[in-house]
Every structure is written in C-alpha cells, then in structure tokens.
C-alpha cells in the first residue's frame, strides 16, 4: 500500500505528458529538502526543468520533420572564406524575424561557396525558434511533386508545402526541369507567396533562370513573386569546400611532419 501514491502519481504524470516531472521529482524533492526550500520553490524548479526539456524535444522534432541532409549551424560557417557574403545580414536573418514577416531569401553564387550550409544554418535557427521548416533540393522536390501527381495525392503535398513557416529549396539551377516539373515548382512558390517564407539557393544569376524553367513568362512570374520581399545573399568566390579540403590536407601534412620529423 505504501507504493500506491507513487504509482498513482506516475500514472497521472504520464497521462499529463510530463515526463521530466516524472523523471526528476523524487531527486529534486530530496535536493530541495536538503537546501531547506519550500514546496513553491520545489515546484518552480520542477516546472522549469519540464519547460527546458519540452523545448529541447520540440526543437528535435522540428529538425527531424525538416528532413535536413545534415544539421549545420551558422556558428560553424567560415565567413572569412566568402568575403562577398554579408555576415551582418546573415546573423540578423538567423533571428528568424524575416519568417514572421513572410520575407524570402535567395543565396546566389558559384558552386561550392557554402550556400547549402547557409540554408541549413538558417533552417536550424528557425527550428530553434519553434517554427516549422521543410528542406529539399529543387530536383528532389520536383520529383516528389511529379510522383504525387501520378499517385493522385498532389493536393495533399501542396498543402503540406504551403503550410511550412519556412521552406528551403536548395540547388535550384543545377538540373534543368521539364515543363511539367517547372510548372509544379512554380505552383509551390505561388501558393507560398506572402503566406510563408522561402529560402532558395542557386548557382545561377537571375538572368539565367530561364534555362531552368524553360519559359521566360514562367521565370518572370516566379521572380516577381520570389523577389517581392527578399534578402539577397551574394556568395561568389573560391570554392568553400575546396578551401576547407585544402586546409584539412595542410593540417594533416603538418601533423604527419610532427609525428615523423625525419621524413619532413
């Protein structure tokens, strides 16, 4: 009978979805008793632990739902390697206030300059603010749209894409699109216009986007919507990935020289 209150409490806390309460209350009760704290302080600490853990789980869930190919933060981006990139603007955008204002971001630059890293970093920052985020490459997204159309579930996918607070479309311009694919992707942008924020990364300047969409009319209409409320990140320069590889190679050579001084 002495265990009945604990069993009932565990049952109620599970029903209320308070896992941190359940996990921590006994240990924290003993700790607060040792410190001479009253029941209000005890409950306050317990509630704070639950809130912190709930926020952590929420962020983890947002990150999982975003389907990032990798989790990267802006803290690990080497801004010095891409002098053309406005670091101040990027760090301001990391506050995710542009999402609330339904503004877009376009990162344009030659291949290997870290555009995907910037997109992932902005996406992670938005997840940490509790915002729903989706990530996909342009080619993969078009493939999903075509597949959904063939399987009679296009409307459901379009509603899902329109519902993200932030949608990140990576590598636009790397693969030319079919006419149907281009039209379906245009619909995604059109349905999100002034309803949600979209981040696009591309290796092509705007005047070459027609080569991707195949139609000047469609490209013009797309750019009109996408650039109405937009922050443009210029990211031209030497390959970010190549420079990172060179630095790693130099460090490895230096380490090898230290380990084997006779071979240096």
Which stretches of residues belong to each language-model region?
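Charged, compositionally biased N-terminal leader segments and the immediate start
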Residues: 1-21
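Conserved post-Walker A coupling segment in P-loop NTPases
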Residues: 102-106, 122-125, 129-145
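Conserved hydrophobic/aromatic pocket- or pore-lining residues that grip, position, or stack substrates
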Residues: 77, 119, 137
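N-terminal pre-Walker A segment at the start of P-loop NTPase domains
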Residues: 72-94
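Walker A/P-loop nucleotide-binding motif
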Residues: 102-118
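Interdomain "pre-motor" coupling segment immediately N-terminal to P-loop NTPase/helicase cores
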Residues: 19-70
